[in-house]
């Protein structure tokens, strides 16, 4: 369910949002990042993902979001659960008058690059970066870099 902008602003102002983030790896061990065109995190490189909608199962959200973000509909079983994360932003989708808080479920999976049809609605460019390269870049948002920090990986299988 998509809300009118005024209703969505009330939700964002009042409650955390639930989202899925995708830690997408190619065959060379590089990870997909898109340069965001919208708030929050506008102008930063960020892993793909998106919000879970009201009354939407996680399975349905995973399929909808992989299609919307990658052009490839994948079942939730394609991803390895990568933990629960918290993202806090000083701005929101419409400006800076209130903050945004996400509770994020991370999923990691590998894809064949040639199967992806990357959209341009929320990102104006895409890159594949190694963990070392993305950790070294201040253009990669701290919330995306956190998925690759050694101290964060300790309890998360896979990386």
Swiss-Prot record:
Motif Nudix box positions after renumbering to this chain: 50-71
Reactions mediated catalytically: GDP-alpha-D-mannose + H2O = D-mannose + GDP + H(+)
UniProt: substrate binding residues: 2-3, 8, 36
Keywords from the UniProt entry: Hydrolase, Magnesium, Metal-binding
Cofactor entry: Mg(2+)
InterPro entries in the cross-refs: GDPMH (IPR033715), GDPMH_Gmm (IPR028613), NUDIX_hydrolase-like_dom_sf (IPR015797), NUDIX_hydrolase_CS (IPR020084), NUDIX_hydrolase_dom (IPR000086)
The keyword Membrane is annotated on this UniProt entry: no
Domain of life (superkingdom): Bacteria
UniProt-recorded Gene Ontology molecular function terms: GDP-mannose mannosyl hydrolase activity; magnesium ion binding; manganese ion binding
Residues bound to Mg(2+): 49, 69, 122
Free-text comment on the cofactor: Binds 1 Mg(2+) ion per subunit.
Documented EC number(s): 3.6.1.-
Nudix hydrolase domain: residues covered: 13-153
Subunit structure comment from the entry: Homodimer.
Physiological role: Hydrolyzes GDP-mannose.
Family statement drawn from the similarity comment of this UniProt entry: Belongs to the Nudix hydrolase family.
UniProt protein name: GDP-mannose mannosyl hydrolase
